[in-house]
């Protein structure tokens, strides 16, 4: 309701087509529902009309309130890198489908295996080929320095690489051992998606800021008698 009070400030109003569509929808609600249902939801035709009007105005106001936001985002501000990575997990699944955690000795043996893979990758071998031969699957991910998935230590190590094709040392974590290869310093698709996300955040911040200011400027009266009925 607060948003609709400021509609005139943005020259936002319902068109004749929208008013007719709302009228038709409210009438259909009245036809399709019994008096008992209407009573439960406090939804007589007049109330439904009012709610639909407010919802429509609110949707139109959202666009108006977000207008003027700076939509320019540089590649530098939104840059997303991409990598391939392997996980040598400390958890296995037995024949009954139960998860089992490796013993300390098994973890040490796995570390030796992972180090051998790391050496081969640093020697120039293809990650997918090396992984496939060992029954592993090379995963891909896009990221920046603030990413935390799939693992923050993996992200930090991959983000520290300076050249495409560089490979991390083995990365020991609580869940297993990672190895990553930097495949792109600027993944175009992921970077463009991040730009859209940044613009959306800016719009939301502007919307929320306006709404908060309007709340401060509006005296909200608490109807105690009404609250007692709720």
Short names for language-model regions:
Residues 120-128, 164-166:
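Glycine-centered tight-turn and secondary-structure capping sites
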Residues 20, 35-116, 132, 149-230:
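PPIase-associated folding chaperone regions across multiple families
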Residues 127-137:
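Short, well-ordered alpha-helical segments enriched in acidic and aromatic residues
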Residues 18-28, 142-149, 228:
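Short linear loop/turn motifs
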Residues 1, 55, 120-124:
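Residues at alpha-helix boundaries and the short loops/turns that link adjacent helices
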Residues 1-42:
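N-terminal targeting/tethering segments
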């Amino acid at each position: 309701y607060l948003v609709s009070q400021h509609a005139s400030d943005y020259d936002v109003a319902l068109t004749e087509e929208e008013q007719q569509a709302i009228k038709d929808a409210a009438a259909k609600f009245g036809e399709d529902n019994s008096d008992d249902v209407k009573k439960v939801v406090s939804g007589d035709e007049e109330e439904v009309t009012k709610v639909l009007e407010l919802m429509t105005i609110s949707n139109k106001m959202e666009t108006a309130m977000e207008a003027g936001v700076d939509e320019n985002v540089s590649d530098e501000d939104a840059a997303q890198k991409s990598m391939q990575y392997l996980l040598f997990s400390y958890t296995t699944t037995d024949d009954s489908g139960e998860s089992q955690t490796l013993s300390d000795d098994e973890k040490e043996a796995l570390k030796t295996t992972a180090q051998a893979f790391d050496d081969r990758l640093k020697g120039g071998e293809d990650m997918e080929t090396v992984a496939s031969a060992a029954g592993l699957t090379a995963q891909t991910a896009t990221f920046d320095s603030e990413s935390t998935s799939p693992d923050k230590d993996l992200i930090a190590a991959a983000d520290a690489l300076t050249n495409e094709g560089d490979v991390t040392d083995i990365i020991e974590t609580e869940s297993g051992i990672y190895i990553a290869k930097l495949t792109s310093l600027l993944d175009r698709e992921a970077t463009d998606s991040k730009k859209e996300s940044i613009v959306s955040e800016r719009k939301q911040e502007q919307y929320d800021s306006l709404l908060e200011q309007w709340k401060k400027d509006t005296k909200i009266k608490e109807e105690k008698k009404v609250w007692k009925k709720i």
